[in-house]
Amino acid sequence: MRTLKMKTAVSTTKIILVVAIILIIAISVGVLLSRKPPSTIPSTPTSTTYTSPTPTPSITTSNFQLEPPNKSVLVDDVGIPFPGDLAPDALDPATGFSGPDTAVFNNVFQELVEPNGSSIYQVVPVLASNYTIENNYQTYVFSIRQNVKFSNGDPLNAYDVWFSFVRELYLGQAVGSSNYAELTFNPENVSATDMTTPWGLLHALQYATGLPATTNYKLASQILNQMLSHFNPDNATQLAVMEYPRQAYVVLGPYTFEVNLLHPYRFFLLDIALWWGAIVDPTFVDEHGGVYNNTVNAYFDANGGPGTGPYEIRSVGVSFSSIVLQPNPLYWGINATNVPAVAQPPHIPIIVVNYGLPQNTRIEDFATNKAQISLADSPSLFNEFYDAYQYKQYYSFNQIFKILGPNPGFYYISMNTQKYPTNNVNFRLAIEHAINYTQILYDSLSFNGTLLGQLILGPVTPSFTPFYNPGNLPLYSFNLNLAAYYLNLAGKQEDFSVTMPNGTVLGNTSAPPLGPLTIYYLAPESQVTRIQLEVIQNDLSQLGLSVGFQGFTLSMLNQWTTPQATPNFVDLEWGPDWADPILQLIAPAVTTTSYLQAWMNLSSVNQIMATLPFLTNQTQQIQLVKQIYNITYNYAPYIWLPNAYVYVFLQPYVKGFVYNALSGYRYNTIYYSNQ
């Protein structure tokens, strides 16, 4: 997906609720290029269905059935190519925070609960045999599945679960910090202690050791380094630490694990269902570098480690150019009963995942049946993809092309609310009403008359009904007269002038002209981005605004941690790590907690957001979301770009492909059949 995750740890004053993957995710978003729109473009899109576009070649009817070249091997050329993320960044689930990582994390490691098929709102127990929710969504108790082993033979128990959750935070990496802030740790304590620890853990250390761990933070770090790098549940002191009741993570018994949150939180199971909830083997970790405060495990990052999942890592290519998976010979799901579908044993033994392949290689691999899963960079390549397909006389385009649905995240151009001239609300409203959003949709996200995206009004996307636009606000209208009205007000307030193409001078007619505007985009520029920016450039020129474009890199993005350092306009996207539209979409967009480039910072909104994520009454939440929508709509901090659909190319014999908009797809459910 295009979803971008800032890889920055929690700072002394900010919570980075990185919403990405997702992060957001095991397949590339349809960041799609299009054909030209019809001569008359409707004011609103005429379709939001996911019907596949249909080139119409001549199909020869026959009994021919394409077979995989090797029924024991699946080749995935998608590689989940994000801008700037062509390969995994790490194979340790406590470090990795990039879309390409999911091929390993989804299939080698497992969580207590995992997504139920394609549903983003439902989970099923996996490493937990069952769970209970207590104390008004503030306490979660898990019974750990017995007779489970890691692929190296080490048995799983509740102590391993405790170790994994503590380690996820203690390494100090963005993936843990972003997904547990304000839930199991208080980010305000990080600067004081120089550690990211679950709440109550330092008190547990002090209770078990008699040492001043709550005041001597260097000593506390030394104790934790020693304990986690020489993890031994048979040690009475370590056991006392884990069993201490007044902390975030508590071991209640060899197969019972409890989580106590800082706040009631209805979506916690959805949070831990992805790889930052993965359970790792303490013995392996300790034998390969151990655990140290704010320090990644270089060996684990480079090579991966044993998990409890259906696959294990067989080999890792140079610079993560490819990863090969093979069946976990000790997989617990082979002989277990009532195994959830997401955890079923694998059907195809060998999985080859290729990363960063050039488009021509992907086209050739799929055309010749070498690859079973692939991706075209944009719809402009759809015809090329199908024209090269050696079996097109037997299979229509729709038989190998699948639209999987909308991206749960949002695409945007931020307008820096703290920096001239976008700090003026009338200026931002002028921009909003000067843009033809429908033109953008039809120009950039359609193919052969089929829309491959939809218009939205953020910050929530339609995937999250009923939190999406609960007040039914209209989309910003394309209205040049209204745009000119707002621009005229802004010019008078900010003392600038703008001359329209017809000679009309807006703003303060005696003031200097407003200088050129620059929209920053993530380099390299995709064809979709280019088309969308050119439409916006043309639209704004009708107001007399001069607009240019400038690429930026991920390293530049990570430096934009203040409003003053951030450009006025930034073209990006943001996606949720888990299915909480409030904490994962609204909070990043309308507060400064995640460094989104609009830097929206309104006391009325901040006051609502202080409690909104932790309310347990959905009706009350929706009413407050409606208030935030109304405020944000009139404040206009973002240009909401169309939401692109997710798509994939599959060979016709590939079955059991189950896509989840947040966790992607898993190889163990896939099988080959022509039925």
Spell out what each predicted region is.
Residues S129-A220, E258, D365, P421-N423:
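Aromatic- and charge-enriched surface segment that lines or borders ligand/interaction sites
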Residues N116-S118, Q222-P245, P254-Y255, N260-V352, ...:
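Gly/Pro-rich hinge or "lid" segments in bacterial periplasmic/extracellular proteins
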Residues M1-T60, S414, K419, I431-E432:
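Secretory targeting signatures
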Residues D76-N135, P306:
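N-terminal lobe/hinge region of extracytoplasmic solute-binding protein
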Residues R314-S315, S321-P327, G333-T337, N423-N538, ...:
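Append "and occasionally in soluble cytosolic enzymes with long acidic Gly/Pro-rich linkers
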Residues P115-N116, Q326-L330, I403-A430, A434, ...:
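A bilobed periplasmic-binding-protein/Venus flytrap-type ligand-binding module shared by bacterial periplasmic
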